[in-house]
From Swiss-Prot:
It comes from Rattus norvegicus. GO terms for cellular component: extracellular region; extracellular space; Golgi apparatus; nuclear envelope; nuclear membrane; perinuclear region of cytoplasm; rough endoplasmic reticulum. This is Prostaglandin-H2 D-isomerase. Keywords: Cytoplasm, Disulfide bond, Endoplasmic reticulum, Fatty acid biosynthesis, Fatty acid metabolism, Glycoprotein, Golgi apparatus, Isomerase, Lipid biosynthesis, Lipid metabolism, Mast cell degranulation, Membrane, Nucleus, Prostaglandin biosynthesis, Prostaglandin metabolism, Pyrrolidone carboxylic acid, Secreted, Signal, Transport. Residues 1-24 form the signal peptide. The lineage of its organism: Eukaryota, Metazoa, Chordata, Craniata, Vertebrata. Disulfide bonds join 89-186. Forms a beta-barrel structure that accommodates hydrophobic ligands in its interior.
Length: 189
């Protein structure tokens, strides 16, 4: 049971940064005229969807985390995520580098020895953002993950439906999707 918090931590980072993968072939769509300055601030990881069998097995054990997005000195983003781990609040910082197109970022994971790509596909900046990662876990193993960021901890039903549609548009199914419950600590409104 002690391994569950570590698995949760890894999955939160998956949602934020994508799965350890090889560089993506081509680029996913990105929010038109993405404005990084409007994307900054506090977000909650409110929904995740993935075609990973591990994710499907563990998704019911996950909780919402809080991420503060700030500009990095290199023009990218610093993501400071706070989450519940072993019944204590833990914070991790990740730096996303710009990938040429506004709204697209890369991250090199020393832990996994891998390269990640992350795209902000759609956002209204004030209420929600849809992020998407894709790649391969190995020969012939396709991986996709959609993430719903929300400015509020409680989601409107319309936003849930919109995320379900977005996830299905990425080739994911209803059973691939989870809306994360709020933990009893570690995040603030």
């Amino acid at each position: 049971m002690a391994a569950l918090p570590m698995l949760w931590t890894g999955l939160v980072l998956l949602g934020l940064l994508g799965f350890p993968q090889t560089p993506a072939q081509g680029h996913d769509t990105v929010q038109p005229n993405f404005q990084q300055d409007k994307f900054l601030g506090r977000w909650y990881s409110a929904g995740l969807a993935s075609n990973s069998s591990w994710f499907r097995e563990k998704k019911e054990l996950l909780f919402m985390c809080q991420t503060v997005v700030a500009p990095s000195t290199e023009g990218g983003l610093n993501l400071t995520s706070t989450f519940l781990r072993k019944n204590q609040c833990e914070t991790k910082v990740m730096v996303l580098q710009p990938a040429g197109v506004p709204g697209q970022y890369t991250y090199n994971s020393p832990h996994w020895g891998s390269f990640h790509s992350l795209s902000v596909v759609e956002t209204d900046y004030d209420e929600y953002a849809f992020l998407f990662s894709k790649g391969t876990k190995g020969p012939g193993q396709d991986f996709r993950m959609a993430t719903l960021y929300s400015r509020a901890q409680l989601l409107k039903e319309e936003l849930k439906e919109k995320f379900i549609t977005f996830s299905k548009d990425q080739g994911l199914t209803e059973e691939d999707i989870v809306f994360l419950p709020q933990p009893d600590k570690c995040i603030q409104e």
